[in-house]
Amino acid sequence: MQYEDENGVNEPSRRRLLKGIGALALAGSCPVAHAQKTQSAPGTLSPDARNEKQPFYGEHQAGILTPQQAAMMLVAFDVLASDKADLERLFRLLTQRFAFLTQGGAAPETPNPRLPPLDSGILGGYIAPDNLTITLSVGHSLFDERFGLAPQMPKKLQKMTRFPNDSLDAALCHGDVLLQICANTQDTVIHALRDIIKHTPDLLSVRWKREGFISDHAARSKGKETPINLLGFKDGTANPDSQNDKLMQKVVWVTADQQEPAWTIGGSYQAVRLIQFRVEFWDRTPLKEQQTIFGRDKQTGAPLGMLHEHDVPDYASDPEGKVIALDSHIRLANPRTAESESSLMLRRGYSYSLGVTNSGQLDMGLLFVCYQHDLEKGFLTVQKRLNGEALEEYVKPIGGGYFFALSGVKDANDYLGSALLRV
């Protein structure tokens, strides 16, 4: 693996090479391919779930407050567009594809069998919506000199740098744009990705990809049941209520009073971390120690010393950490103080399983994704509190990046990123 230096890596030569490959692919001379390990598949939901549909048009993009679907994919791309007009063409094209794929319809028929088929065919003759959401975010690198967008960069957007416990692989970090693709079933997610790549060979090149899942019963609960991660603990118990609009305005969405560029209003900062678990080591760790590390009962999810998952721990009555250790994950992540209220964020994580590492260990972990109105007050502040926690012995962040999720598409005459590109 190629590892990141502390401040990340710059790859202009790679982008130029990929642009040339993309042009060949558009001409039908060279397919764009990126080798990846075989991904794990979540189970299937009921047939009725295929007809579930999320609205595409609105103030915010779907896939952020949407209750988690069972299947998910993160795909980062390098943008091959040559200028701002080309970038607008890309965003308009993505908007068109997202609108069709998320709402469903008949698969296009290929008029000439001597030409490549217009659709991959993996969903059959009808493309069901299947609760599909595709969320577009932009990375720090999109605001370099290529498109003249530097003055419009979100104020808190930055390149992800290494924390003390990180072991970042450069091939799994950053990206000009990121797609978070979620649906009830994995074949719908894969179909969406292939459709997008087919329509953008001269504009996008895959940088890295990871697929994730949560259990079907957690997905069917529509946010009422907390998913369990591959360490066996509930993941996201302390999430703020995504159905509380007033709270989401405070926690997730960029608002006019933040002195951000005007185009960012209605969008959200997105932090992505690919975290590898040392599951064999974890499975040989005593239950009591596991629970002490997290600060929760493994079966119920309740804070130690309490009965129910959503009971609020009373740290003031446990100042020495005799019940919930001072360095436990939940106590460090959210100390429940007046100051920590400003670091709330909405988590939307998924498990992943990739096979085995080069050393023969199971390659499993967490695709950590969170949204917040301020990256520094949210994820970065929380992660700094977590530096040195006991859990670090069992987890290793290996990739990801920081992005900005664009605001929504108003109507059929609008397109993703229009407010940014019209400045």
Swiss-Prot record:
Catalytic reaction annotation: heme b + 2 H(+) = protoporphyrin IX + Fe(2+)
Cofactor: how and how many bound = Binds 1 heme b (iron(II)-protoporphyrin IX) group non-covalently per subunit.
Keyword hit for Metal-binding? yes
Q: Which GO-annotated molecular functions does the record name?
A: ferrochelatase activity; heme binding; metal ion binding; peroxidase activity
- Pfam families under this entry? Dyp_perox_C, Dyp_perox_N
Query: Its GO CC terms?
Result: cytosol; periplasmic space
EC id: 4.98.1.1, 1.11.1.-
**Per the record's keyword annotation, is Heme included, yes or no?**
yes
Query: Where, subcellularly, is it found?
Result: Periplasm
Q: Which residues form the signal peptide?
A: 1-35
Record note on modification: Predicted to be exported by the Tat system. The position of the signal peptide cleavage has not been experimentally proven.
- The entry's keywords: Heme, Iron, Lyase, Metal-binding, Oxidoreductase, Periplasm, Peroxidase, Signal
Q: Which cofactor does it need?
A: heme b
Q: Which GO terms describe its biological process?
A: iron import into cell
Q: Where does heme b bind?
A: G236, T237, A238, H329, N334, P335, R336, R347
Family membership, please give it. Answer: Belongs to the DyP-type peroxidase family. EfeB subfamily.
**Subunit description:** Homodimer. Part of a ferrous iron transporter composed of EfeU, EfeO and EfeB.
NCBIfam families registered for this protein in UniProt? Dyp_perox_fam, tat_substr_1
Described by its record, this protein's role is as follows:
Involved in the recovery of exogenous heme iron. Extracts iron from heme while preserving the protoporphyrin ring intact.
* Stated name of the protein: Deferrochelatase
Question: Species name for this entry?
Answer: Escherichia coli O1:K1 / APEC
